[in-house]
Amino acid sequence: MSSLIKEIEEAWQIKDKLLQDSSKLITLKQTLNDIIESLNQGTIRVCEKQENSWHVNEWVKKAILLYFITTESQLYNNNYNSWYDKVAPKFSADTDKNTFKEAAIRKVPGAVVRTGTYIAKNVVIMPSFINIGAYIDEGTMIDTWATIGSCAQIGKNCHISGGTGIGGVLEPLQAKPVIIEDNCFIGARSEIAEGVIVEEGAVISMGVFIGSSTKIVYRDTGEIIYGRIPAYSVVVPGVLPAKEAGKPGLYCVVIVKQVDKTTRAKVSINDLLR
């Protein structure tokens, strides 16, 4: 692995000149293709949890960006569409039944998944878009018209509801993508962006928008935090009142309650949001 990282780091230093060196380019392209395949298999990840905190593998981001630099756009076709892109689809018209059965996933018409994306077993992909570098863990549902951004990390047994946007990020290199940990529910038409972490078991109501500067308010105490939804929180949209009468309030999101793991498992999402 260290030699692989070294090769990517060296190529990154001369990225603006790569296309001028055909011999080096051939070798690098093979390395990049191998990395993209490792992302497909989930053996390499853009972001990993280490000792209870998330760590960005910047070299993997660099590899993806180098892949864009060194790859020419091609024409792709399936049975009902054609497109012109640098990134191949993970699944194409040539993907056979056995491939899907072995992967143990379900993918319906209209679902677009770019190569370099990991899709674990028992994932259901409705018509949606999943970008390169994303990681979707076991038992998760990506619902209709959801968008999973580049490098976004989605945990096990999550439900990403219809029309939801999960932000991704390739640059800046050190920036974390959005991370949705295990057993989370993200309500319809919500948007989670700018590296926000939604911790395990959290429930996000419909129509909630959270970025790095969004105020996240504990309803009980008034405490305000940023960039992180604590584990097993139930979150709804809200407004912070203005300090001066007659002035407009400002949007925030509100943690209305926090439940334990047992309650989260037993109680329906609708009951938690009431």
Swiss-Prot record:
Stored Pfam families: Hexapep (PF00132), Hexapep_2 (PF14602), THDPS_N_2 (PF14805)
Binding residue positions for substrate: 106, 143
Protein name, UniProt field: 2,3,4,5-tetrahydropyridine-2,6-dicarboxylate N-succinyltransferase
Keywords from the UniProt entry: Acyltransferase, Amino-acid biosynthesis, Cytoplasm, Diaminopimelate biosynthesis, Lysine biosynthesis, Repeat, Transferase
PANTHER family hit by this protein: 2,3,4,5-TETRAHYDROPYRIDINE-2,6-DICARBOXYLATE N-ACETYLTRANSFERASE (PTHR43300:SF10), ACETYLTRANSFERASE (PTHR43300)
Subunit description: Homotrimer.
Chemical reaction(s) catalysed: (S)-2,3,4,5-tetrahydrodipicolinate + succinyl-CoA + H2O = (S)-2-succinylamino-6-oxoheptanedioate + CoA
Coiled-coil zones: none
